[in-house]
């Protein structure tokens, strides 16, 4: 009987260790995915500011109000 108890405790302990290792790896993967999402959103924000700056420059060159040029660019980007 004592042998069965020890075996059962050993199996449960190893299962618990295995489970905690899997959960840790899962958390690490989620953190990596979150970092990738953050990097992608930063890139999108950077591209949007570049487009906005180009739109402002184009508006100044064409003597149009900057808001009208930005509106046209926003519509063009939104259609894609």
From Swiss-Prot:
Tissue localization of expression: Expressed by the skin glands.
Keyword entries, A-Z: Amidation, Amphibian defense peptide, Antibiotic, Antimicrobial, Cleavage on pair of basic residues, Secreted, Signal
Any one annotated GO CC term: extracellular region
Signal peptide from the UniProt entry: 1-22
Any one GO BP annotation for this protein: defense response to bacterium
Propeptide: 23-43, 79-80
Residues found modified as Valine amide: 77
Span list, region Disordered: 24-45
Coarse class of the protein's main subcellular location: secreted
Subcellular location: Secreted
Segments of skewed composition (Acidic residues): 30-40
UniProt function note: Possesses a potent antimicrobial activity against Gram-positive and Gram-negative bacteria. Probably acts by disturbing membrane functions with its amphipathic structure.
Family: Belongs to the frog skin active peptide (FSAP) family. Dermaseptin subfamily.
Name under which the protein is recorded: Dermaseptin-A5
Organism: Agalychnis annae
């Amino acid at each position: 009987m004592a042998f069965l108890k020890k075996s059962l405790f050993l199996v449960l302990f190893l299962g618990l260790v295995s489970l905690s290792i899997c959960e840790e790896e899962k958390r690490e993967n989620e953190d990596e995915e979150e970092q990738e999402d953050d990097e992608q959103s930063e890139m999108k924000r950077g591209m949007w500011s570049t487009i906005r700056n180009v739109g402002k420059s184009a508006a100044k060159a064409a003597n149009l109000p900057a808001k009208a040029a930005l509106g046209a660019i926003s519509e063009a980007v939104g259609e894609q």
